[in-house]
């Protein structure tokens, strides 16, 4: 966003689950529509909305309600991407969003992408494998927002549920003071 402002580079892209989780109503309840509206206000309707923070079907409905059928793309980051992309394509087409693209991500590499051949996927978000290269060991570390202004927040998408609220680490130590495990 800063490069766009400073250098006149058109802003584009998607958002993280933490962006969606940051948007809560006055009762601390998730407000996915507010997150989508904020992203569209900044990036326009041609942006890519991440629709699987909570419920994918509802996320697509919310995206279309906020952006209309001219939405640039939706991104799916969880579940069986082939099955989910087919379901989402059907939902988009039934709503008249024929030109809305489907982008998938989720630790993709060339093998996972090849497995999606034939599915209605228009683009791929590849991160880890681009940095490390195929077959190299990786650490699957992901930032998870768990609380906003004292209210627990959590991703509830199928297969990637998180638990909201602050956490404390309880560690077991050897007599020498070396940590040996977490309880």
Regions found by a protein language model. Give the residues of each.
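Buried, small/hydrophobic-residue-enriched core segments of structured protein domains
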Residues: 1-98, 110-115, 119-120, 132, ...
């Amino acid at each position: 966003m800063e490069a766009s402002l400073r250098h006149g580079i058109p802003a584009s892209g998607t958002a993280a689950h933490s962006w969606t989780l940051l948007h809560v109503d006055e009762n601390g309840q998730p407000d996915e529509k507010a997150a989508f509206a904020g992203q569209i206000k900044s990036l326009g309707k041609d942006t890519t909305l991440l629709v699987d923070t909570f419920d994918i079907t509802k996320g697509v409905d919310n995206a279309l309600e906020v952006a209309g059928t001219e939405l640039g793309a939706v991104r799916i980051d969880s579940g069986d991407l082939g099955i989910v992309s087919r379901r989402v394509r059907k939902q988009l087409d039934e709503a008249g969003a024929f030109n809305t693209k489907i982008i998938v991500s989720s630790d993709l590499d060339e093998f996972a992408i090849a497995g999606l051949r034939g599915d209605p996927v228009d683009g791929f978000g590849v991160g880890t494998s681009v940095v490390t290269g195929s077959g190299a060991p990786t650490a699957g570390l992901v930032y998870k927002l768990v609380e906003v202004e004292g209210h627990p927040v959590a991703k509830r998408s199928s297969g990637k549920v998180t638990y909201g609220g602050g956490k404390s680490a309880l560690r077991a130590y050897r007599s020498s003071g070396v940590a040996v495990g977490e309880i």
